[in-house]
């Protein structure tokens, strides 16, 4: 198994998709809204992916809640991260965040999906790419609510991914469209990073996804392609022992690292264990070609993806019959209603 996670276009696998999944350098897949119609179809799609290869691939999705929840019909709607703190009751917010983490993880696991790239640890709501995905602008409040959501995910049996290290919240630009630059002073950026540092010290983050953001006070490369951030800071200073993902290498924020093949090489050299390449099949194929060349000189085989597989076994039918699921779903539905009222009165 290698370091690359890929995507595909449809609601079922094509022969080309299956062939790609069988490449020994592919570690798994990331799913999007375009891959989902309704629960029965998703169940069949996951079975197709599992049957395509003898290796157990890592099946992942962005399912944070709010505007970044790829599967909606038939799933519990997870409130956006900002909604929890708007309750103005920290203990209640933490309790609901635990429930949200548990529900989002259990529902995905019930479909044999291993991982949601959750939680977002960026501070503040001004960044276009982050906005309501952030728990709070106050680092301690964000830390406490995120920690509770992580506990809920872990209770369900899902690993967690903190993103976007060392912090994407204070750049206005959207890294999907350009490479943002955070030109604040070192001390301020280091303060933003403390939420990652504390959760690493608590042993709560299983994986970390760095930002496609440049921090000139430290380095001239995006964090996703910077050995300073990924090796010196994350591994040596913060003693992070988990898995590092690149964010999507097809995003415009990664373009300063070169073409797709070059981006992959830069990210690997900088210290990314696993690479995401989405929404551009030709780009993914170029990366795979480059990885095959690199693999001849130095083995790129890695078991890092296997560390993130879920071991919980439950069917969706079993889950939805449980009182715990129904209780949590009701509470989250009420929070969604409160958030809708808040959002409409603040626009």
Predicted regions and their residues:
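N-terminal hydrophobic targeting/anchoring segments and the immediately downstream early-domain regions
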Residues: 1-59, 67-75, 345-347
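Glycine-rich anion/phosphate-binding loops
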Residues: 37-44, 88-106, 138-144, 187-190
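Divalent metal-dependent hydrolysis catalytic cores, especially in the metallo-beta-lactamase
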Residues: 28-34, 114-120, 272-275
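Short, conserved phosphate-binding/catalytic loop or strand-edge motifs used
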Residues: 121-129
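Glycine-rich, aromatic-flanked loop segments that form ligand/cofactor-binding clefts
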Residues: 50-79, 97-122, 142, 149-166
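Preference for extracellular/luminal or secreted protein segments
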Residues: 1-27, 256-347
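Active-site mouth loops of central-metabolism enzymes
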Residues: 3-13, 81-99, 178-190, 250-258
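Second-shell residues forming the walls of enzyme active-site clefts
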Residues: 34-52, 57, 69, 147-154, ...
């Amino acid at each position: 198994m290698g370091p690359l996670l890929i995507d595909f276009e449809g609601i079922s696998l094509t022969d080309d998709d299956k062939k790609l999944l069988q490449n020994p350098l592919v570690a798994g897949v990331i799913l999007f809204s375009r891959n989902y119609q309704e629960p029965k179809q998703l169940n069949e799609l996951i079975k197709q992916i599992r049957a395509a290869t003898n290796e157990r691939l890592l099946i992942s999705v962005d399912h944070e809640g709010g505007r970044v929840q790829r599967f909606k019909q038939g799933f519990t709607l997870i409130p956006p991260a900002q909604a929890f703190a708007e309750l103005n009751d920290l203990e209640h917010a933490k309790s609901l965040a635990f429930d949200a983490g548990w529900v989002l993880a259990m529902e995905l696991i019930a479909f044999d999906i291993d991982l949601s790239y959750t939680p977002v640890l960026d501070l503040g709501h001004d960044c276009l790419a982050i906005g309501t995905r952030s728990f709070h602008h106050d680092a301690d409040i964000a830390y406490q609510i995120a920690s509770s959501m992580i506990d809920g995910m872990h209770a369900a049996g899902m690993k967690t991914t903190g993103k976007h290290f060392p912090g994407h919240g204070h750049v206005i630009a959207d890294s999907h469209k350009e490479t943002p630059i955070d030109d604040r002073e070192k001390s301020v950026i280091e303060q933003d990073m403390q939420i990652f540092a504390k959760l690493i010290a608590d042993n709560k983050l299983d994986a970390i996804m760095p930002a496609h953001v440049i921090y000139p006070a430290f380095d001239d490369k995006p964090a996703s392609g910077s050995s300073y951030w990924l090796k010196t800071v994350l591994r040596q200073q913060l003693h992070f022992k988990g898995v590092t993902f690149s964010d999507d290498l097809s995003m415009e924020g990664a373009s300063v690292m070169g073409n797709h093949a070059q981006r992959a090489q830069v990210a690997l050299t900088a210290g990314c264990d696993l690479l995401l390449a989405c929404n551009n099949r030709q780009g993914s194929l170029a990366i795979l070609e480059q990885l095959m060349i690199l693999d001849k000189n130095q083995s790129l085989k890695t078991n890092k993806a296997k560390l993130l597989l879920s071991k919980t076994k439950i069917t969706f039918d079993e889950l939805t019959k449980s009182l715990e699921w129904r209780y949590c779903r009701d509470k989250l539905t009420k929070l969604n209603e409160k958030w809708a009222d808040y959002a409409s009165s603040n626009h």
